[in-house]
Amino acid sequence: MTAFDVLVIGSGAAGLTTALALAEKKKVLVVAKGSLTGGSTAWAQGGIAAVLDAGDTFQNHINDTMTAGAGLNRLETVKFVIENAPRSIERLVELGVPFNKDEDTLHLTREGGHSHRRIVHVNDATGWAVQDALLKSAGDNPNITMLSGRSCIDFITDRHGEKFSGRGRVWGVYALNEKTGEVEKHVARATVLAAGGAGRCYRFSTAPRGATGDGIAMAWRAGCRVSNMEMMQFHPTCLYNLDVKNFLITEAVRGEGGQLLHPDTGDRCRVDYEPKRMELAPRDGVARASEEQIKRYG
C-alpha cells in the first residue's frame, strides 16, 4: 500500500485540474469509478462561459447568473467563478484544448440565460476535448498516479477502527477494484472529493450512469455538512426514443436559434411561458416548461 500526499476521487475536470495544481509540490493519486473518461465532463457538449467579448462585463455575467439562480446563489462564489473564468480558459488553452476560433480570437456562441455571447467551445464536443487534454497532462506528470475501475465505498476514518492520528480525520478511501472484486485501501494525508452528482437517482436523466451520488453519501457518513441537495439540475432537452438510448441535445442548439415546438400545432411552446426570452431563458425555467408540456401532451 503506497501512501500519497493527496488522494483525488474523480477524474473529471474538477478532479484533474485539482490534481495538476497540487502535483507541482505533492504526490497525487487519482481514482475513478469505471473508466477515466466515464464522468460528466466528457459528456458536455456546448461549451464554457466566460466574459471574453469587448462589449461584455463581469457585472453583466454576474447579473445573468443571479437571475438564472432566482437570487439563491451565493454572491461571493458567483463573483469568484466569473472573475476567474477568463484565466481558466487561458489555462485550458495552455493545456492543449483546441477551442474554435474566429480568425485570431476565440469563437463565442450563446446559450440560455446569457445576455451576451460567452460560450467558448470545441465544435459540439467541448467536454471530450477538455477531458482529453487534462488526461494527457495528468498522464505526463510524474507526480500523478491514476487508477480507473475503483468504485469508492467509504472514507477511511476512526469509525472503522483505523488507528491513525487525529480523531474525525479522513485518511483516504476504501475502494472496490471492479476487476478483481477486492476492496482496496488507498491512504493519503489529504483527500479531495470530486466524484460528481446524483442525476442517475432519477428515472429519466441525461447524466452518465455512474452519477449515483456515491461521493455525497460517503461525505455525509463521514460527518460532512451536506446542503442544497434539492438543487438538482436537469437539462431541458434530450432525444427520447424507445428504440434507441436517449441522449442530450446541447444547449447551443437553442442558443443558435433552435426552437421548441408543440407536437400537434407546430407553434413555439415557450411563448406561453416566457415570450421575451423564449428558448434562451435560463435552464431551470425551460426544463420545468418542457416537463409540463410532456405531461400535458405526452
Question: How does the language model describe each region?
Answer:
Residues 2-4, 180-190:
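Core beta-strand elements of the Rossmann-like FAD/NAD(P) dinucleotide-binding domain
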Residues 50-81:
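Glycine-rich active-site loop/strand segments that organize a redox cofactor
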Residues 36, 218, 224-298:
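An anion/pyrophosphate-binding glycine-rich loop and adjacent beta-alpha core
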